[in-house]
């Protein structure tokens, strides 16, 4: 579920 968080952060940035 860590990859999901990274994906979200990348989406925000």
UniProtKB/Swiss-Prot annotation:
Superkingdom to which the source organism belongs: Eukaryota
The keyword Membrane is annotated on this UniProt entry: no
Keywords from the UniProt entry: Amidation, Amphibian defense peptide, Antibiotic, Antimicrobial, Immunity, Innate immunity, Secreted
Gene Ontology CC terms: extracellular region
GO biological process: defense response to bacterium; innate immune response
Tissue expr: Expressed by the skin glands.
Keyword Acetylation: no
Residues bearing the modification Leucine amide: 13
Subcellular compartments: Secreted
Recorded family membership: Belongs to the frog skin active peptide (FSAP) family. Temporin subfamily.
Record's function text: Amphipathic alpha-helical antimicrobial peptide with potent activity against Gram-positive bacteria, weak activity against Gram-negative bacteria, and moderate activity against fungi. Also displays anti-leishmania activity by damaging parasite membrane. Stimulates insulin release from pancreatic beta-cells in a dose-dependent manner, without increasing intracellular calcium. Protects beta-cells against cytokine-induced apoptosis and augments beta-cells proliferation. In vivo, intraperitoneal injection together with a glucose load into mice does not have effect on plasma glucose levels.
Name of this protein: Temporin-1Tf
Source organism (scientific name): Rana temporaria (European common frog)
């Amino acid at each position: 579920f860590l990859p999901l968080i990274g994906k979200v952060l990348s989406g925000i940035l």
